[in-house]
């Protein structure tokens, strides 16, 4: 059995080698010739699975993507060919939410506002958007959510129209898939008209898919230099990056918002377990068994936390400025975008850290944000 695996998928070689011969390849440059004699294909979002890619894959029976997003896979084609497909919904939701929160916390410090006085507008209430909503509301931040699909499905949450959200939110964060058809297409959802309508004191964060925002229009909006702020983890034509847009962004990173070690381990184990089930193998893997101890596994608090404490704790685990600085330093080199993703550091989630304190420390909201908490006597 031959299993072709994206070389950037952590723990994959160790796990899948229990099932057959593992062949590692860079996901973005896969060709039809690479899939000759391949029984199973394990990918990430940089691999476009289409008719051209699988044209010579006569033995292919299984495709798994270790990502929450699935818009890079022609699912109808796979179904037509009798090829089983699976994804890893929700695997990276924590990492993306913590990326957004890091952007918010750093900007609050730089621009002199309190995150607790901001209204956050979340566009897209799927796995990531819903988790982010839960975290922010858990610590007392006002949230507006927009998702016409969820609303029409009968989701009982209180939804907001996109127009109202764009008017009332101080922070607008995007968490939609990329779609070009249907009732609510998201390609250039944030277009020139919308960008020009946004206030100078608003913040736009895109950690979803690059083409959700018209990058050319965003560049023109930021060139007004009126204080409007934008942070991008994804770019419209990545791995190509508009070098005129880059210096205008508050933060820029190479599509790594969901690249925390826990999230990647979850994605790998989810598709590994699906493949084991598919071939009738009883092996199963658990992400928690693969993870090392965090660099700072425990923090003791001696007083009730405040916003300064929150900033220290969250940035100790993940500070977006680290990735932003590397991105600006290295992006000019050939192949840098994918190389930064391939060599991404072992970033951890808040859950890797246990906060210890008395009942007076009021740790419960921090647990809702994702930290482990331990109330001391």
From Swiss-Prot:
Reactions that this protein is recorded to catalyse: 4-phospho-D-erythronate + NAD(+) = (R)-3-hydroxy-2-oxo-4-phosphooxybutanoate + NADH + H(+)
Biological processes, Gene Ontology terms: pyridoxine biosynthetic process
Binding positions (NAD(+)): 127-128, 147, 176, 233, 258
Subcellular locations according to the entry: Cytoplasm
Keywords per UniProt: Cytoplasm, NAD, Oxidoreductase, Pyridoxine biosynthesis
Pfam families associated with the record: 2-Hacid_dh, 2-Hacid_dh_C, DUF3410
Tagged with keyword Cytoplasm: yes
Sites where the protein binds substrate: 45, 67, 259
A single GO cellular-component term on record: cytoplasm
EC main group: oxidoreductase
Pathway given in the UniProt record: Cofactor biosynthesis; pyridoxine 5'-phosphate biosynthesis; pyridoxine 5'-phosphate from D-erythrose 4-phosphate: step 2/5
EC numbers, comma separated: 1.1.1.290
Listed SUPFAM superfamilies: Formate/glycerate dehydrogenase catalytic domain-like (SSF52283), NAD(P)-binding Rossmann-fold domains (SSF51735)
Entry annotation: catalytic residues: 209, 238, 255 (proton donor)
GO terms for MF: 4-phosphoerythronate dehydrogenase activity; NAD binding; protein dimerization activity
Residues passing through the membrane, by range: none
Function: Catalyzes the oxidation of erythronate-4-phosphate to 3-hydroxy-2-oxo-4-phosphonooxybutanoate.
HAMAP family: PdxB
Oligomeric form and interacting partners: Homodimer.
UniProt record similarity statement: Belongs to the D-isomer specific 2-hydroxyacid dehydrogenase family. PdxB subfamily.
Listed name of the protein: Erythronate-4-phosphate dehydrogenase
UniProt source species: Vibrio vulnificus (strain YJ016)
């Amino acid at each position: 059995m031959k299993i072709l695996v994206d070389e950037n998928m952590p723990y994959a070689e160790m796990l899948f080698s229990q099932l057959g011969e593992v062949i590692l390849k860079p996901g973005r440059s896969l060709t039809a010739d690479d899939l000759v004699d391949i029984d199973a294909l394990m990918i990430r979002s940089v691999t476009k699975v289409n008719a051209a890619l699988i044209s010579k894959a006569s033995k292919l029976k299984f495709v798994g993507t270790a990502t929450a997003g699935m818009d890079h896979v022609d699912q109808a084609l796979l179904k037509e060919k009798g090829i089983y497909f699976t994804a890893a919904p929700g695997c990276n939701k924590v990492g993306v939410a913590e990326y957004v929160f890091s952007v918010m916390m750093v900007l609050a410090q730089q621009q002199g506002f309190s995150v607790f006085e901001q209204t956050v507008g979340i566009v897209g209430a799927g796995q990531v958007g819903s988790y982010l909503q839960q975290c922010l509301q858990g610590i007392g931040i006002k949230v507006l959510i927009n998702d016409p699909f969820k609303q029409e499905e009968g989701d009982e949450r209180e939804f907001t129209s996109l127009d109202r959200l764009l008017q009332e939110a101080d922070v607008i964060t995007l968490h939609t898939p990329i779609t070009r058809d249907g009732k609510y297409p998201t390609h250039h959802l944030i277009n020139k008209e919308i960008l020009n309508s946004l206030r100078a004191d608003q913040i736009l964060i895109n950690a979803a898919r690059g083409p959700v925002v018209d990058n050319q229009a965003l560049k023109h909006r930021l060139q007004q230099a009126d204080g409007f702020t934008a942070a991008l983890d994804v770019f419209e034509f990545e791995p190509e990056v508009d070098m005129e847009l880059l210096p205008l962004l508050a933060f820029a990173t190479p599509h790594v918002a969901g690249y925390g070690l826990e999230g990647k381990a979850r994605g790998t184990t989810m598709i590994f377990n699906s493949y084991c089930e598919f071939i009738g193998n009883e092996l199963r893997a658990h992400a928690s068994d693969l993870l090392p101890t965090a660099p700072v596994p425990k923090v003791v608090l001696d007083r009730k936390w405040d916003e300064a404490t929150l900033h220290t704790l969250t940035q100790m685990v993940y500070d977006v400025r680290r990735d932003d600085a590397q991105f600006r330093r290295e992006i000019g080199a050939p192949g840098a975008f994918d190389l930064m993703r391939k060599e991404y550091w072992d970033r951890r989630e808040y859950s890797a850290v246990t906060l210890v304190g008395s009942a007076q420390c009021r740790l419960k909201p921090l647990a809702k944000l994702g930290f482990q908490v331990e109330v001391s006597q």
